[in-house]
C-alpha cells in the first residue's frame, strides 16, 4: 500500500496526525534543530533545491530562509494534507517568492533535467513505497553535474547510493550524508 492510499484509511489518518505531532514537537526542534541539519547538508544562499517529502514543513521554512531571494526551494509531498499545511506556513512566513509547494511523486518529479543544485531527503527514507533504484535514477536526472544529494538518516542507504554508480560520497556531518552527482 502506498502513502496516498494509507492516508485515506482511518488508521492511516491517525498515524499521519501522530507523526505530524512528533515532527513539530519542541523536543525535535531542541535536539534536531533544522538549521543545524540544513547547514550540514550544505544549504546556502542562491541555491535551487528540491525537498522530497516536506511533511509538516519542519525543514522548509528554515531552508528557504537560508537559500534567500536569489534561490528557490521546491517543497514536494505526496499527501494533500502536508501540501496544504506547508503552503500555509510558507504564506505566513512571507516566503512564497522563494518556495513552491507542490504535490508530487519523487519517482517522477516532472522537473527539468539537471535543473537543481541540491536535493534533500530528510526523514523520508526508509519509505517502503520509495524503491531506491528508481528514486536515485530520478534524483540523478534532475541534479546538475556535481549537484548534491543530502540524506538524513539513515546511514544504511549509503551502500545503495554508492552502488547506484550515480553518486560519489562526500561526507557525513550531524547525521547528514552528502553525495555528489557524477556523470
Stretches with model-predicted labels:
Residues 28-45:
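Conserved alpha-helix/loop element of class I SAM-dependent methyltransferases that forms part
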Residues 79:
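Conserved SAM/SAH-binding beta-strand->alpha-helix loop
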Residues 95-106:
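Conserved SAM-binding strand-loop segment of SAM-dependent methyltransferases
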Residues 107-119:
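A short acidic, Gly/Pro-enriched loop at the edge of an enzyme's catalytic core
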Residues 117-131:
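A short SAM/SAH-binding and catalytic strip from SAM-dependent methyltransferases
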Residues 133-145:
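A short glycine-rich, Lys/Arg-flanked "PGG" loop and its adjoining helix->strand segment in the class I
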Residues 146-153:
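Conserved beta-strand signature within the Rossmann-like core of class I S-adenosyl-L-methionine
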Amino acid at each position: 500500500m502506498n502513502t496516498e492510499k494509507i492516508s485515506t484509511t482511518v488508521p492511516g489518518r491517525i498515524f499521519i496526525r501522530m507523526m505530524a505531532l512528533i515532527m513539530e514537537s519542541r523536543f525535535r526542534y531542541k535536539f534536531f534543530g533544522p538549521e543545524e541539519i540544513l547547514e550540514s547538508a550544505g544549504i546556502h544562499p542562491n541555491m535551487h533545491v528540491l525537498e522530497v517529502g516536506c511533511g509538516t514543513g519542519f525543514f522548509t521554512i528554515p531552508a528557504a530562509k537560508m537559500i534567500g531571494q536569489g534561490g528557490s526551494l521546491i517543497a514536494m509531498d505526496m499527501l494533500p494534507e502536508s501540501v496544504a499545511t506547508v503552503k500555509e506556513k510558507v504564506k505566513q512566513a512571507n516566503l512564497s517568492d522563494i518556495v513552491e509547494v507542490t504535490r508530487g511523486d519523487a519517482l517522477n518529479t516532472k522537473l527539468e533535467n539537471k535543473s537543481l543544485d541540491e536535493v534533500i531527503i530528510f526523514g523520508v527514507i526508509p519509505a517502503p513505497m520509495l524503491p531506491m533504484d528508481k528514486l536515485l535514477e530520478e534524483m540523478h536526472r534532475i541534479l546538475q553535474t556535481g549537484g548534491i544529494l543530502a540524506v538524513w538518516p539513515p546511514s544504511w542507504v549509503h551502500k545503495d547510493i554508492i552502488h547506484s554508480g550515480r553518486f560519489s560520497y562526500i561526507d557525513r556531518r550531524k547525521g547528514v550524508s552528502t553525495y555528489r552527482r557524477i556523470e
